[in-house]
Amino acid sequence: PPEEPALEAKVPEDSDMRGQWGKRPQETIDRANELLDDFASLLTKRGIRVDRPTPIDFSQPATTPDFHADSQFGCMPPRDVLLTVGSEILEATMSYRCRWFEYLCYRPLMQKYWEEDKNFKHESAPKPRLTDADYHADYLSEKIGVEKRLKWTAEKFFVTTEEEPLFDAADVLRFGKDLVVQHGFTTNLKGIEWIRRHFSDHRVHAVNFPGDPYPIHIDATFTPLRPGLILNNPQRSLPDEQRKMFEKNDWEIIDAAQPAHNSPPPLCYSSTWLSMNVLVLDPKTVCVEKSEVYQAEQMDKLGMEVIPIDLRDAYAFGGGLHCCTADVNREGSCEDYFPNQT
C-alpha cells in the first residue's frame, strides 16, 4: 500500500519499501500462495480443519468520508484482524487505513460459523474513523531517527493518539482468563480499555517493550509456548515491573534464539525476529520456519516436536507462521494460569 500516517512510522528510513506501492510481482504472489497452500495441507493432514479467507480486490482504493488510501493491503495475516476468545470471534478495529476493509475477507467464514454453531458469537469492534487526529503528525520518519524513536517508545509515545479506540488482534495474547495486550503503534490505551470492558469476565493486562523502535504486534516479541514458559525477544525485554505477574505464578520467561538471517526478505514489513513467530499446535508441538535453524534447535532442547515449514518467501505479504493463521476453535477449557494477581 502507499504511505499513510501509520505506515510511515513503521517503515525504517533505509528500507527498500520507501516510496514503493502497488501490486507485487506476480511470481512472488504465486510463490507465496504455493507456500500457504502447502502449510494448509500439512495442517489438514494432522487433523486440523483449515478454512481460507475470500480475498477482495486489494488494488482498489480504500475510501471513506474521512480518508482515502490509493490501494489496500491483503489478507495473508488473519491473526491481525480476528481475535477468538471463548465462543466469540471479534473483528479488531485495525489502525491502518489501507486495512480498513480487510474484515470483508472473513465475513463468509463468520456467516458459516454462525450457521454451524448456535453458541458462536460474531462481534465487530467499532470501526474507527482514522482521521488525521488519530496520528501524531510529528512521527513522520524522515524527521526523526531511531534513537529518538526509542526514547519515544520508552515514554509510551507512539504514532497513534488516544482520539478513539484502536487495536489490532495481533497485539493480544490469550492466557485463559487473562488477556495480555501490547500498547504500541497499532493498539492504543483506549483500545485496551475497550477490550477490557468488552471481555469483562477476563483480566486484561497492558504491556510494552521499550527496546522496540517499531512496536507493532506482539508475536515476534513475546511468545507463549506452553503453560509456564514464554519466549521473549532479547532485544525487547519485558520491563521488570510487568514481569511480576508471571513470576508470582511460576512462569519462566527465556530469551529467544537468534534469527538465522541478518535481514528480512525483500519488501518485507517485518524484522528478522519473525524467527520466533511460530505456531504452537499443542504444548509439545510447534511449527517453525524451516530456515530458522537456531530457533528450531532451541525448541528441540525445550522438549518440543518441531515441524519445519517453508514460509520465508511469503513473509513480505504479512508475516510468519502465527501471523498467517487465526485460531477458530481449540480443545480445552478456559483456565486460570495466573491465580496470584499483583
Regions found by a protein language model. Give the residues of each.
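The feature marks the mature, well-folded catalytic cores of soluble enzymes
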Residues: P1-T342
